[in-house]
Amino acid sequence: MITEFLLKKKLEEHLSHVKEENTIYVTDLVRCPRRVRYESEYKELAISQVYAPSAILGDILHLGLESVLKGNFNAETEVETLREINVGGKVYKIKGRADAIIRNDNGKSIVIEIKTSRSDKGLPLIHHKMQLQIYLWLFSAEKGILVYITPDRIAEYEINEPLDEATIVRLAEDTIMLQNSPRFNWECKYCIFSVICPAKLT
């Protein structure tokens, strides 16, 4: 009963996700460009990851902490916004959804990004930090907090430097042109599309 509900809900969320034309999501900018492309071209492989227990656990922890932030810090949760950039003479939308946004006493936004991880080694991870920095740019915010929940600890890291627009344009170019695939050497090890990818690192 509960298992069926969780799996069905996860699949419905995945299938309802339709990418708009000339739109790049923040998460696309911090992962392998080929993986982003393959998720659209090989949907059957992408769907298989929907049922991973670790993904469902992450969703549940997100919902729980977002509820705590909403109830105790007056946070807005699942806040979406977008900004436009010019890449090669063409306008693209950079779209993102922050886990939560808290207003401080001065009315300024603090962007909260929640991450779950099996390990607490090497935190904060560079791609997570970059993601939050892009959110700071996207929401015109000066402060962000990266919250990690792992089996061994709960930790938060303050990020106060938005990514500059020139870097975001370069990341978007990589995503569009399939350059710098993968972005990080470790990505292939965990990628469902590695079985068909010519850029796989051995």
Swiss-Prot record:
Spell out the activity-pH relationship: Optimum pH is 9-10.
Report the outcome of residue 191 to A.
Answer: Abolishes iron-sulfur (4Fe-4S) binding and exonuclease activity
Which UniProt keywords are listed? Answer: 4Fe-4S, Antiviral defense, DNA-binding, Exonuclease, Hydrolase, Iron, Iron-sulfur, Manganese, Metal-binding, Nuclease
GO biological process per UniProt: defense response to virus; DNA catabolic process
- Biophysicochemical property: temperature dependence: Optimum temperature is 65-70 degrees Celsius.
Superkingdom to which the source organism belongs: Archaea
Q: How is the cofactor bound?
A: Mg(2+) or Mn(2+) required for ssDNA cleavage activity. Can also utilise Cu(2+). Binds 1 [4Fe-4S] cluster per subunit. It may be important for protein stability, since mutation of the Cys that bind the cofactor leads to a colorless, insoluble protein.
Residue positions annotated to bind [4Fe-4S] cluster are 32, 188, 191, 197
Protein known as: CRISPR-associated exonuclease Cas4
